[in-house]
Each structure stands twice: as structure tokens, then as C-alpha cells.
């Protein structure tokens, strides 16, 4: 019966969450009443569409293999060449649409729960659902402000952020002439929501990796604090996650490799990396099916760069198991080597479960804490965190701990950022967000007809354009400069 109700509520809310941008209209039909009903509403709000993976096309983690013969998905091209708008042929902006739909679901729950006191029997579930709603709203606004507004920095706090409805009724009243609140206000609200979520979720039982629990929430808080330069708080939140979970020792992958004629057979279309016990590091799955990403087909146009792969191949005599996430192991002497190329993305394949995109994982807490240490003059502690990570990534017979004495404060930070790049490649759009906060470096992409496209240092295109549909609905809203 509950499943039938959930389906009904999901279809009901889909009717008024599937409209353009913030244009969400209520309908009179069966409405949720109990805490369990609103739990079902909230579950319908968790994103089940990809809202970040295309951003990797715009980074230094991806190149175009022009020898590939597979058909090119034309909607990928504006991202790769940094077009003035990422919307292909004026198609709707699914990122904007998905994120604001999820905000609406969260707001619906928070509106209903505001001022209510649950019964003793309801209290635990009531607080869990409310805490998840706060966490989900913060998560969505984190993505919205990092996609459509300037990065967090003192000089950007008063610049236009994104529309920020905090009630479901706000959406109904403001489908026209929406207002972009400032960047600073959005980040302030994200932190407020995370604080409220923490109060509700602490001590609550996890309900699965497709929902926020307290540990996943702390991992997300560590991310937010890192982005906002609150390094002490980032260290504290990341430490909670690190103390609560254990890293997967990739030496266990050796059993996949022993006795194989080709290493590529270990992580092929049948077995992605996520099918190993590596999945135990995942704290939160999000978005659509991970094996639908653009980078894991052998003959696809867009592939991981060799620069990324080479960060896992620093020493030819050392086996870093992470190389197998990005290395195609194609035979250079084969007729189709040029088309296959040296790289492929093996994280996802045709799993039967656990196949959504990685939203948060344990290793992010390690590289976040290491970066926070490095930025606060604790370079030795940063290297210690890297060693804790690398001993689980490198073959035991090859592993040699990094020597703290070999690093200056500057080189320690650089190494941390390199390990972060490897660990978080293709996870939740993090590379694009990191590039934005790390000075918006210049990037060059070679594409068809020998043309080289350039994203300049500090380029305005590091901020996505406000969707055309929103521009039409809110003609007075400032758009992002180009």
C-alpha cells in the first residue's frame, strides 16, 4: 500500500515539478498527510537525473579523440568548446530544472513540518525527514550557485547568485520576474540549512546510500567549509567522516587481475570499478545511472586525458591501482588503437545495483582535510593524510610513504591538489568546481577541423549562462556577462 501511495505522490508532484525552470503549479488531488507520506514526498525529490556530468567536458580532465567513429552527442559540444551558452539548440536546461524541482520537494516538506510538534512515536522519523530536506536543499543550492554564479570569494559576495525560494509557496508566487539573491546570501543559506540538518540527523539510523545520513552530511559540510575557506571547520567535519569509515584497500583488486590475459578484461563493460568493494567508500549516490556517462565507451569521442592518467603513473615501476580507472589497456599495435585511445573511464559499467553517480565518498574527506591542513601551515599533517590514502591505492610491494621532509608548504599543497584531482575525477562535477575556486586557469581543447578552443585565465565562461527560459520569464533578471 505504501508503495502505491509513494507512486501516486511521485506522479502527482512530477506533474507540477516538470514545468519550465521555477514554473511549478499546484494541482488539487490526493495530498500527503502523515510523516510517512512526506517521507515519500522527500524521496521523490532526490535527484534521479544527471545534473553535473557534462561539466567535466569543460575541464582539463577530458579531451576529444578525433579518431573515434562513434556518433557524437551534439548536446555535449557546447560544453567542450565553452560556447556562450551550454544549452544546445535552445533545448531546456535540465540541470536548472532538476535542481529547482528538488528544491521544491524539500521546501514542500519543510513548509508542512514548520511549527509542528511530532508525537513521541513520530519524532525520530519526523526529524530524519526534516533533516534530509534541509540537507537536500543545501545540496541543490550548492550546485546552483557553483554552476550559475561566481565562485565564493570576498570580491564576489555581492554579485548576483541564483533565485533562492525557501518555501514551496515562493515558487507559485514568483514564476515570473524571479530575483537572483547575492552569492553571499546563497552560501549563508547553505550553511544555515546544513546546521539545521545536523541537529536533526545526529544519532539517526542511516536509511541507505541514496539518502543523506549524518556521515554523508558531515562529508558535505567539509566540502562546503573548504570552498568557503573555513579550514578549521572543514578539518573537524572531515575528521568525523574519516573516524567513522574505513578506506577500501585497492590491493584487493589484485585478485581481479591475476591470471588474466588482458587487464582490460577485469574492468570491462561487465565489471566497472564500482562493482568491487570500492563501493563501500561511497557515502551518497546521486543522479541518474552512472553507466550512462559519456566517458566509459571504448570508442566514444570524449575521454579522460593522459595528463589525468599520468598522475597515477608517476613511477613506471610502481603500480597505482587507480590507473585502471582511466587506462584503456588497448593494444598499441591493434588496428583500432587510434580509435580506442589510451584512456577510458571504468568506474561504472552494467551493474545490477549501486550504479548511480557518486555524490560523496570517503576519500574526498581525506583530500579535503589534507588541503585544509596544507592551507593552514600544517603541511606535515597534510602529507600524513596523503600517506593514509596512498597506502590503500598503491600495490603493497611497491608502496613507499611520502617523506614530509621532501615537501615545502607550496609543494605539499600542489601534491594534495593532484591527489584530489585523481580521487574526485568525474565525481559530481567536482573538477569544474575546483578549477573555479583555484583561480580559473586557462584550458585548451582541440576539436574538429584542427580548431583549438581556449578558455582563458579567469574567463567569464567559468560561470554558466542563466537558461533562456528563465531569461524570458524574468526579463529584468541580470544575466551573466560574456
What is each PLM-predicted segment?
Residues 19-65, 312-317, 397, 410, ...:
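Membrane-proximal, proline-rich intrinsically disordered regions
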Residues 28-32, 58-68, 149-162, 203-291, ...:
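Short, surface-exposed recognition loops and adjoining beta-strand edges that mediate ligand/DNA contacts
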Residues 39, 228-229, 235-361, 411-432, ...:
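Extended ligand-binding clefts on enzyme/binding-domain cores
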Residues 76-148, 181, 194-203, 352-357, ...:
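Conserved, well-structured interaction surfaces
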